Amino acid sequence: MVNGLNASTMVKVLNKTLNFEKGNGLLPTVVQDVDTKDVLMVAWMNEESFHRTLETKETWFWSRSRQELWHKGGTSGNVQHVVSMALDCDGDTLLIQVKPEGPACHTGRTSCFFNEVERS
């Protein structure tokens, strides 16, 4: 269950409000640590990765560079267990709160957001 709903109920509810069309079949997806509230990463979901995420309760994304489904942690073991999912007001961006098993970033850092932007 995600947010207290089973996957099939969640799909019925969200399919009515998900807007994959705006992003040419992709939804930008913000992944947040449910405990620390840190933003871990931003990735892209297509309909298949969205459904796999609901079914497995682990995050799946669409790799734009490799043009394939990507199970986060499938190779590294750094999976992300889904706690909750929420859509923004337009239905075109997804927020997923997770319990991560290890770092989210391929650099080994907890978050992909570690590059400070300097002000001039």
Segments from the language model and where they lie:
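C-terminal binding/interaction regions
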Residues: 4-26, 32-40, 45-120
